[in-house]
UniProtKB/Swiss-Prot annotation:
Chief location bin: nucleus
Presence of keyword Nucleus: yes
Keyword set, alphabetical order: Activator, Cytoplasm, mRNA processing, mRNA splicing, Nucleus, Repeat, RNA-binding
Region (Disordered): 283-311, 345-379
One GO BP annotation of this record: lncRNA transcription
UniProt key word GTP-binding: no
Segments of skewed composition (Pro residues): 345-358
Protein's UniProt name: CUGBP Elav-like family member 3
Amino acid sequence: MKEPDAIKLFVGQIPRHLEEKDLKPIFEQFGRIFELTVIKDKYTGLHKGCAFLTYCARDSALKAQSALHEQKTLPGMNRPIQVKPADSESRGDRKLFVGMLGKQQTDEDVRKMFEPFGTIDECTVLRGPDGTSKGCAFVKFQTHAEAQAAINTLHSSRTLPGASSSLVVKFADTEKERGLRRMQQVATQLGMFSPIALQFGAYSAYTQALMQQQAALVAAHSAYLSPMATMAAVQMQHMAAISANGLIATPITPSSGTSTPPAIAATPVSAIPAALGVNGYSPVPTQPTGQPAPDALYPNGVHPYPAQSPAAPVDPLQQAYAGMQHYTAAYPAAYSLVAPAFPQPPALVAQQPPPPPQQQQQQQQQQQQQQQQREGPDGCNIFIYHLPQEFTDSEILQMFVPFGHVISAKVFVDRATNQSKCFGFVSFDNPASAQAAIQAMNGFQIGMKRLKVQLKRPKDANRPY
């Protein structure tokens, strides 16, 4: 039976061929094991070289940590084993955030409110520079069970005098959660993250790809809209109009049996709102047929593609998928889930015969060269140091996409342990995006560290001539 205050341990630096039955003899000498689980990739099922361990008794966990952490190196590993409380324990589900307090309540008032649930290590009401209460506090118990009991009893249980809503009691955020939230706030201030893209994931990949084009334009601080940028903006307006009517809110799955969700079928084209102007340009007026007015003026001479008339209905999701094809080569992992969700359009022309072997070989060589070209031009590649240990390629891609079109984003990983080295690189397709990323993210704090973002030196920078 597990004790209420038992500690969940994270075990790292273990060989990938060792399963639970192989690891148990190492840890059973310190006490009875309640649960031991090797962590595996949820998609591939591959061993990740780490595990979670929970003893029945708290003392057993402390003994194991004291005897093994950084003390013993398992066969086949270059670094000693890591045994420490898991993230949820170290933060550790003992510290509570208390919101919607009255402005007049003191530390002692809050302590009296929470004392019935256990021993309190810390109790602090947050105050501004002038000493005025911010209406919230942090309370830290000795055990997770005590903190959980306080949440179960007090959360939303009452409205305190001077508060505008019921009492809020929840576990405090981790450093990682606060860091990610600040990154999202920075991106929101830059006006480059789409809430639609963040909410609907793979179904909005087309929108995210178009946003990269717009982000690069913003990073360059250019007031002139090029024809290609104007086209991207018009396309983004079209997608925003579709999303505003809830057309992307219903996921399409292969089992649904239809390529058009009910929201699309029930929404007439005339109900789609007019798109907003781009950088001061007014939206192009349209006739009832869906075609642009004959006297309309277009920025840079680029005609926006109008919504389809009722006489020729086209699935807007299928349009999005068709327009997304040329982005899939750059980010295959990001779009791998999209293809099954969108049915393939019917062939409009007869199937072409396969190219001759010589042409196939040339195409394969070109594809290999494109895959090998991971870096952008000189002045477009940046290094990022002091990354959190848990950050992967997808996290730094999400972090730097707002600044422009990303060619590649990579976190360096130790080949022996498959653990992050806490630094990586990002390549853009233009210097302006790289400089904008450096200015915004260099010195950005995540947890206890600040990111160091700098430009990679050109290949010939060290040459004396």
